């Protein structure tokens, strides 16, 4: 019960920041139709190796969603047909399933986890970039509000097949599996996977000024471009009547991983030190002698008074 209360408080902080940047909350199904995913070639186990797949009684093959770019893009075809319908920003909190080879460290890396995934649909790259920075700022607010902002760094990482770079938000902890290199004077960080002379030159960084940090990834933001809108035919008519594909972005935060990270970085020798914003309760009231009716009555009065004044 205590852990769930903290999870819910983290979720509410994330929800609040998503709503502030005009995100609309939705809920999508976890069961995935393979036909949609085949259009982007991500049903193929050679391309994506962490699917959980199953079959219905009629032998129809389904998958358990590890992300939702394909199904949401397909749905948005019914809601976006003109540039006047853009931009759109939608997000959800949902349990994801990933057949991870190395599921370990409790809620820091599991095969089943609660995730906030946000998706943006924009007219063009310029409009997308403006929102991308808004999400980045919202993420910084989230990490500050839950008490780990001072240890969390926006980090250049591989853009995969989507873009030159993506950005990860990496929190310093010995429990992490990632390595970043941080320029403490500028605050710029790069993931070990892109730690090359070419990237450092592009970011105007010097190797000798970088400090190695062990970290855990607590969030990420991706520019998707037309990676999904093109094969799934999410197309709009622009202001000149020309047809163009929608420019997309994807932004994730693992709620359970945030909770686990707080425990790792803020605990002391006596146990967990929850930041007030996510602590399961504001205070603990202990009645030391429940056999004494006067003491018990007074304790109940204090308890009722605290509740009336907004304490939990």
Question: What are these model-derived regions, one by one?
Answer:
Residues 1-312:
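NTP/phosphate- and nucleic-acid-binding module
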């Amino acid at each position: 019960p205590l852990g769930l209360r903290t999870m819910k408080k983290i979720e509410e902080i994330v929800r609040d920041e998503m709503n502030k940047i005009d995100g609309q909350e939705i809920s999508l199904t976890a069961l995935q139709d393979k036909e949609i995913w085949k259009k982007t070639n991500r049903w193929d186990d050679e391309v994506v190796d962490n699917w959980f797949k199953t079959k219905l009684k009629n032998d129809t093959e389904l998958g358990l969603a590890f992300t939702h770019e394909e199904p949401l893009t397909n749905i948005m075809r019914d809601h976006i047909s003109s540039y006047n319908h853009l931009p759109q920003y939608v997000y959800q909190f949902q349990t994801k399933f990933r057949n991870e080879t190395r599921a370990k460290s409790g809620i820091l890396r599991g095969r089943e986890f609660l995730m906030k995934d946000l998706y943006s649909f924009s007219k063009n790259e310029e409009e997308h970039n403006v929102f991308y920075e808004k999400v980045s700022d919202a993420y910084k607010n989230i990490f500050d509000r839950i008490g780990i902002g001072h240890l969390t760094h926006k980090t250049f990482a591989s853009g995969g097949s989507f873009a030159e770079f993506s950005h990860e938000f990496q929190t310093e902890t010995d429990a992490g599996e990632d390595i970043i290199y941080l320029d403490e004077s500028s605050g710029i960080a790069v993931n070990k996977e892109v730690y090359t002379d070419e990237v450092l030159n592009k970011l105007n960084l010097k190797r000798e000024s970088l400090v190695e940090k062990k970290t855990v990834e607590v969030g990420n933001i991706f520019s998707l471009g037309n990676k999904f809108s093109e094969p799934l035919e999410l197309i709009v008519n622009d202001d000149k009547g020309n047809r163009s594909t929608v420019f997309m972005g994807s932004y994730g935060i693992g709620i359970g991983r945030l909770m686990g990270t707080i425990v790792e970085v803020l605990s002391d020798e006596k146990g967990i030190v929850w930041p007030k914003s996510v602590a399961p309760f504001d205070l603990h009231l202990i009645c030391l002698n429940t056999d004494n009716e006067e003491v018990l009555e007074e304790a109940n009065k204090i308890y009722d008074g605290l509740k009336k004044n907004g304490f939990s």
